Regions:
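Conserved CoA-thioester-binding segment of acyl-CoA-metabolizing enzymes
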Residues: 1-52
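A general structural signal for well-ordered alpha-helical segments in protein cores
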Residues: 8, 29, 75, 135, ...
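Short, small-residue-rich loop/turn micro-motifs
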Residues: 8, 51-53, 60, 115, ...
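Hydrophobic alpha-helical membrane-association signature
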Residues: 28-31, 71-74, 104
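Glycine- (often His-adjacent) and acidic-residue-rich active-site loop
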Residues: 51-84, 97, 127
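Crotonase-fold acyl-CoA enzyme core
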Residues: 83-155
């Protein structure tokens, strides 16, 4: 589900679920977390996360196991691992980053964004509240007012 390459001190992780627009499921969350841990253990100096195809990450795979017990824990653990990584993690956002895909970019230290990229947190449109981590992280990055606009407009 992921491809890992290394060029010198740079490890690149490519999400490879192009048929699902790189949507996250439990297995992908575990693989990303393990890739971060391995890059750190192998003395990488930086990690880049990107998506194969035209999408960075379409969010949680709603046709998969995201409703199963344990998915949200796997997602939270992956995000925490990225945030706490002692090396810079760069999200190379090559296309849409929706829902959990936006969370993946928020967990990263830097975001390099292609002109075709867009971000969305559609939870409000679905009648679902946004988790506290996402609200705090987005507000810390772009400010409270703009973050409220994103959440209230479900953009």
């Amino acid at each position: 589900m992921i491809g890992i390459s290394r060029d010198g001190d740079v490890v690149t992780v490519e999400l490879q679920r192009e048929e699902r627009r790189n949507a996250l499921n439990t297995q992908l969350c575990v693989e990303i977390r393990e890739a971060v841990d391995k890059a750190v253990a192998d003395d990488a100096r930086v990690m880049v996360i990107t998506g194969r195809g035209s999408s960075f990450c379409a969010g949680a795979d709603l046709s998969g196991d995201v409703y199963a017990e344990g998915f949200t824990d796997s997602l939270a653990e992956m995000l925490r691992t990225i945030v706490e990584a002692p090396i810079p993690v760069i999200a190379a956002v090559n296309g849409p980053a929706i829902g959990a895909g936006t969370q993946l970019t928020l967990a990263s230290d830097l975001r390099v964004v292609a002109p075709t990229a867009r971000f969305s947190v559609p939870a409000a449109r679905l009648g679902i509240s946004v988790d506290r981590w996402t609200v705090r992280r987005l507000a810390s990055l772009i400010g409270g007012g703009p973050a409220r606009a994103v959440f209230l407009a479900a953009e």
